[in-house]
Swiss-Prot record:
Highest taxon, organism lineage: Bacteria
Cofactor note: Binds 1 zinc ion.
Zn-finger region bounds: unnamed: 3-34
Molecular function terms, GO-annotated: ATP binding; DNA binding; zinc ion binding
Keyword Transmembrane: no
Disulfide bond entries: none
HAMAP family: NrdR
Name listed for the protein in its UniProt record: Transcriptional repressor NrdR
Main function: Negatively regulates transcription of bacterial ribonucleotide reductase nrd genes and operons by binding to NrdR-boxes.
Species of the source: Pseudomonas fluorescens (strain Pf0-1)
GO biological process, one term: negative regulation of DNA-templated transcription
Cofactor section: Zn(2+)
Keywords for this protein: ATP-binding, DNA-binding, Metal-binding, Nucleotide-binding, Repressor, Transcription, Transcription regulation, Zinc, Zinc-finger
């Protein structure tokens, strides 16, 4: 680490502590050349994978697009913003946990459906009807019957 005072390359870590709920490391450093002390903060760069669309095109992950789609499904439903944000964090965590640089958009769609099913079954059906392109009432009935049979996976 370069010293911000004299530009020397040799610094020594005097103290390290976790801060920001363990998301950051605070380090107290001392320059071996000039003796000045300074603080650095380190955070991991967590990059979300790019999405591979069904047509084969690739695009960066867009959190706002994800949020808007979920909000549309949850419109006029009794789900708090906090619960929605928690679901978004959960989806992003699962995407990062894949360790992949690219994931199929279908993976994101399935993660959204799983989260919406936990949040609100009506919102889940709304999203599923568009996502899975329901063509008639029978497809709605089949999905509702499946929901009634299968417990929600936490």
């Amino acid at each position: 680490m370069h010293c911000p005072f004299c530009g020397a390359n040799d610094t020594k870590v005097i103290d390290s502590r976790l801060v920001a709920e363990g998301e950051q490391v605070r380090r107290r450093r001392e320059c071996l050349a000039c003796g000045e002390r300074f603080t650095t903060f380190e955070t991991a760069e967590l990059v979300l994978p790019r999405l591979i669309k069904t047509d084969g095109s690739r695009q960066p992950f867009d959190e706002e697009k994800l949020r808007a789609g979920m909000q549309r499904a949850l419109e006029k439903r009794p789900v708090s913003v906090e619960r929605l944000e928690s679901s978004l964090v959960h989806i992003k965590h699962k995407l990062r946990a894949t360790g992949e640089r690219e994931v199929k958009s279908l993976v994101v769609g399935e993660l959204v459906m799983a989260e919406l099913q936990k949040l609100d079954e009506v919102a889940y059906i709304r999203f599923a009807s568009v996502y899975r392109r329901f063509q008639d009432l029978n497809e709605f009935r089949e999905e509702i019957d499946r929901l009634a049979r299968e417990p929600v996976k936490e």
